[in-house]
A protein has these predicted regions:
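Extended, highly charged accessory segments
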Residues: 25-30, 36-192, 198-206, 211, ...
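Phosphate/diphosphate-binding loops
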Residues: 1-30, 34, 42-56, 110, ...
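Flexible, glycine/charged-enriched surface loops at secondary-structure junctions
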Residues: 128-133, 216-223, 325-332
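Alpha-helical context
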Residues: 90, 94, 98, 189-190, ...
Length: 332
């Protein structure tokens, strides 16, 4: 009879007790009290999901041009059928059997993307378990643009608007809307190099270009490898992102800019995870979407429209990224 209420705390919830006043404060009461003085700050958080919605998806390349680009980025028919297709058809990653007798990337005599040289090597058991399904209230892929300063420095934090998206994965239409939205505050950096240039010199070039752009007030860097041709080759995007991210950190400039990637290499969730892990803010896998369009035109997705295929693919990537986040991950 002396128990007034009972229950248990959910993920991210708290309670408070004022013993001298004999009061118990619930999770919502505490958070409402703390949030009162931050109303102005909340008005500066601008959600871009409606402005950058998935609609009227278009492809960039098709036919022989697309096949050449797929070959250039090391995307095989097996990748399209066993990895890409199930992600759009089932809205989740394909399930495969255990066992992989292929050589390690460093020992292989076949082309392996740079992503294959990185492994998710460690998973820490926690109690209670960190699970992206049961802990969905405190796990999010919400992505923040601009104003990347110290979140504890409130005076500085409230000087500029903060733009957020629910996912770091952008479709082709979203990416175009993104570029138009930020306009002059974004600059594109070409991540390809010609036959007479070295990869080392090209990396130095994009590092210098990024520094100049940030010092000129640009808030959105766009790293793109779309300019490949008979005379220009793509640089490994993972290397480009990591090089620019580290360079800007050393120059004390990283907090002023977001790094957005337009890559033909990214296809599976591991490639997205590694790109984000080395510093990418958003990723637009344009060749993956063009490959989906190619398969959609062949009526391989049944009743689904192309827009729906794109949405289902992004949904599968998001779900897997949350699973990767739910464990302690070290990349070697």
């Amino acid at each position: 009879k002396r128990i007034l209420s009972k229950g248990r705390l959910g993920p991210g919830e708290i309670i408070g007790v004022r013993i001298e006043k004999g009061k118990v404060f619930t999770n919502n009461q505490i958070k409402d009290y703390l949030a009162k003085e931050y109303k102005h700050f909340n008005s500066q958080i601008i959600d871009l999901d409606e402005k950058l919605s998935i609609s009227n998806e278009k492809h960039n390349f098709d036919g022989e041009d697309l096949r050449r680009r797929q070959h250039t980025f090391g995307i095989s028919l097996e990748d399209l059928e066993l990895i890409l297709h199930p992600m759009a058809e089932d809205a989740k990653e394909a399930t495969g059997s255990m066992g992989d007798d292929t050589p390690l990337a460093v020992l292989s005599d076949k082309y392996r993307p740079l992503y294959h040289f990185f492994r998710q090597n460690f998973s820490q058991v926690t109690n209670p378990p960190i699970d992206s399904l049961r802990e969905n209230k405190v796990m999010s892929l919400k992505t923040r643009f601009g104003n990347l300063g110290n979140i504890l420095d409130f005076d500085t934090l409230t000087k500029e608007n903060i733009y957020v998206l629910n996912s770091p994965i952008l479709s082709n239409s979203q990416f175009n809307k993104f570029i138009n939205f930020f306009g002059k505050n974004s600059v594109s950096i070409d991540c390809t190099f010609s036959n007479d240039q070295s990869l080392f010199d090209s990396i130095k070039r994009i590092q210098k270009d990024s520094e100049i752009a940030v010092r000129q007030g640009v808030t959105q860097l766009v790293l793109s490898d779309k300019a490949i041709s008979d005379t220009r080759m793509p640089m490994p995007m993972l290397l480009c992102v990591g090089a620019i991210n580290t360079f800007l950190i050393d120059k004390k400039l990283r907090g002023y800019v977001s790094i957005n990637v337009q890559s033909g290499e990214a296809l599976d969730t591991h490639s997205f995870a590694t790109l984000i892990g080395v510093g990418a803010t958003t990723v637009n896998p344009y060749i993956a979407f063009d490959s989906l369009y190619q398969r959609h035109e062949k009526k391989l997705f049944g009743q689904y429209s192309f827009d729906e295929c794109v949405e289902r693919y992004i949904k599968s990537v998001n779900a897997r990224l949350l699973k990767i986040m739910s464990k302690w991950v070290y990349l070697f």
